[in-house]
C-alpha cells in the first residue's frame, strides 16, 4: 500500500509439512514474499512467516544526502527444534526486526553505504541447549556495508 508517508507491505508465507524448502546458499537470497535480510527459511517444512514492511525515503541535506529506510517486523513459526525432518537446522520460533538505512550521497554517484540493524528474539519453549539458540535467536546484529555500483 502506497501512501504519502511511504510504502507498506504485508506478506505471509506457508511451507506445508509435506514439503521442505531447500535452496542452496550459492543461489543467493531466498525469493519468498516474507524474506527479511539475515533470515533463512531454508531447511524448513511446516513453516509460517508473517512480515510487515515499511519503506520511506526522505531528504536529510537537500543538496547532498537522501536516506531510504526499510523497517520490517516478522514473526516466524517453525516446527519443533528437536524434529530434524521438518526443521533441518533446528531453528526455533522467533520474531525478527530489521532496520535498513541506505545513504544516497548525491556527490558520489555510485556509492551507496548501508546500515543494517537486526534483532531476532526467540519465541516459545525450546530446550536450554546452545545448539538451539546460539547465533540463531536472542541476538542483535549490526552491519555497515559499503555498496559501490559500477
Regions from the PLM with identified roles:
Residues 22-44:
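Flexible internal linker/loop segments at domain or repeat junctions
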Residues 3, 12-18, 29, 58, ...:
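Transmembrane beta-strands of outer-membrane beta-barrel pores
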Residues 52, 136-150:
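Outer-membrane beta-barrel "beta-signal"
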